């Protein structure tokens, strides 16, 4: 993956005008200073500042313009901007009344039926003066963590207070939301962010925070983020705070996952049918304490971009997939991983004449 400094454009971020607290900048690692997390400091405040998922965000912009918002469910992987999008929508709709007319709950903590009966119902009953056509908004983050009983109670509450209140649910998997709630909501789906989209935001933050970096450092951050903007910014800030410089070595010290260069070398040995050298690297990663899930995940991600014959790459990915399935089912021994390497080496060997 080649890293290009993609800056500006729709992905440009502005620091919030109403930051709850300033970020006091001192030398990285120095004690006695408070640093606002960059995830919060550079959180978008307007819908047009959100990176990625342009089609879905444009639908939210239509809701914000027209003011007639349905109940909505936003489903997608972590760190793609689901909660931020809902907050931006609420800010655009409610304006100065945001504090009084919005209730935000994290359903992974407040997940029981009592929360629906007490907090949500009491807020829905409150009278708030709003412009014509505007409604109070209740945001339920991690809504797929709610119990079935709480979701059934929420369904009834959504019906009773539909004239005054709108519900916005953010979740990772929409299939964990019961059908009656899904049928009452517009379901919007977010996908993982691309490397270029993450790079755009990283470059903007790097410029504002004056972070020294190398291209391989940015490549490492994007590799470890896996389409998650929150993780990318957290890894960037953690590496800068700990080392003051962004390069691949420092990033992998912070993220601590199997180094892709080692994994790449291991795959190269498999392509060369050198099982002994490949196993040495696997055993080294195993004894460093990495879980089989971490190792197999990185083998797959490195293999996708590895330069080899296309037919061979397809065979490799098929074997990696089978092994990943066995590991997920609980068969996660070193022997299982060694068997994968043996099968990969076998794919590259010329058949023995009988």
From Swiss-Prot:
Q: Does the keyword Nucleus apply?
A: yes
Q: Which residues carry this modification: N6-acetyllysine?
A: 163, 304
The record's listing under SMART domains reads: AAA (SM00382)
Keywords linked to the UniProt accession:
Acetylation, ATP-binding, DNA replication, Nucleotide-binding, Nucleus, Phosphoprotein, Williams-Beuren syndrome
| CDD domains named in the record | AAA (cd00009), HLD_clamp_RFC (cd18140)
Query: Highest taxon of the source?
Result: Eukaryota
| MF-aspect GO terms | ATP binding; ATP hydrolysis activity; DNA binding; enzyme binding
Phosphoserine is found on 18, 30
Keyword field contains Flavoprotein? no
InterPro entries recorded:
AAA+_ATPase (IPR003593), ATPase_AAA_core (IPR003959), DNA_pol3_clamp-load_cplx_C (IPR008921), DNA_Rep/Repair_Clamp_Loader (IPR050238), P-loop_NTPase (IPR027417), Rep_factorC_C (IPR013748), RFC_lid (IPR047854)
Tell me where in or outside the cell this protein is found.
Nucleus
Q: Where are the transmembrane segments?
A: none
Family classification: Belongs to the activator 1 small subunits family.
Q: What does this protein do?
A: Subunit of the replication factor C (RFC) complex which acts during elongation of primed DNA templates by DNA polymerases delta and epsilon, and is necessary for ATP-dependent loading of proliferating cell nuclear antigen (PCNA) onto primed DNA. This subunit binds ATP.
Which NCBIfam families does the record cross-reference, listed alphabetically?
PRK00440.1
- Tell me how this protein assembles: Subunit of the RFC complex, an heteropentameric complex consisting of a large subunit RFC1 and four small subunits RFC2, RFC3, RFC4 and RFC5; the RFC complex interacts with PCNA. Forms an heterotetrameric complex with RFC3, RFC4 and RFC5; this complex has ATPase activity but is not stimulated by PCNA. The heterotetramer of subunits RFC2, RFC3, RFC4 and RFC5 interacts with RAD17. RFC2 also interacts with PRKAR1A; the complex may be involved in cell survival. Interacts with DDX11.
What protein is this chain from?
Replication factor C subunit 2
């Amino acid at each position: 993956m080649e890293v290009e400094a993609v800056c500006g454009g729709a992905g440009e971020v502005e620091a919030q005008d109403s930051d709850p607290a300033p970020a006091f900048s001192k030398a990285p690692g120095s004690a006695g200073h408070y640093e606002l997390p960059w995830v919060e400091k550079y959180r978008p405040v307007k819908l047009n500042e959100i990176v990625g998922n342009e089609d879905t965000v444009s639908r939210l912009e239509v809701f914000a313009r027209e003011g007639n918002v349905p109940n909505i469910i936003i489903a997608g992987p972590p760190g793609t901007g689901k909660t931020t999008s809902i907050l931006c929508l609420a800010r655009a709709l409610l304006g100065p009344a945001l504090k009084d007319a919005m209730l935000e709950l994290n359903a992974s903590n407040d997940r029981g039926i009592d929360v629906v009966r007490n907090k949500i119902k009491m807020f829905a009953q409150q009278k708030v003066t709003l412009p014509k056509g505007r409604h109070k908004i209740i945001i339920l983050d991690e809504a797929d963590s709610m119990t079935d009983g709480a979701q059934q109670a929420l369904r009834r509450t959504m019906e009773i207070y539909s004239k005054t209140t709108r519900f916005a649910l953010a979740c990772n998997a929409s299939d964990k939301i019961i059908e009656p709630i899904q049928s009452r909501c517009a379901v919007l789906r977010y996908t993982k962010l691309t490397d270029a989209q993450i790079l755009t935001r990283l470059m903007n933050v790097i410029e504002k925070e004056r972070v020294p970096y190398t291209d391989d450092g940015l490549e490492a951050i994007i590799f470890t983020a896996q389409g998650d903007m929150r993780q990318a910014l957290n890894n960037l800030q953690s590496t800068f705070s700990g080392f003051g410089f962004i390069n691949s070595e420092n990033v992998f010290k912070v993220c601590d996952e199997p180094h892709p260069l080692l994994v790449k070398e291991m795959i190269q040995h498999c392509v060369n049918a050198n099982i002994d050298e490949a196993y040495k690297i696997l055993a080294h990663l195993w004894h460093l304490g990495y879980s089989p899930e971490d190792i197999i995940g990185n083998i797959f991600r490195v293999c996708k971009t590895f330069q080899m014959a296309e037919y061979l790459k397809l065979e490799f990915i098929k074997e990696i997939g089978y092994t990943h399935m066995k590991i997920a089912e609980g068969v996660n021994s070193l022997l299982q991983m060694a068997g994968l390497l043996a099968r990969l080496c076998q794919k590259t060997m010329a058949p023995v004449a009988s």
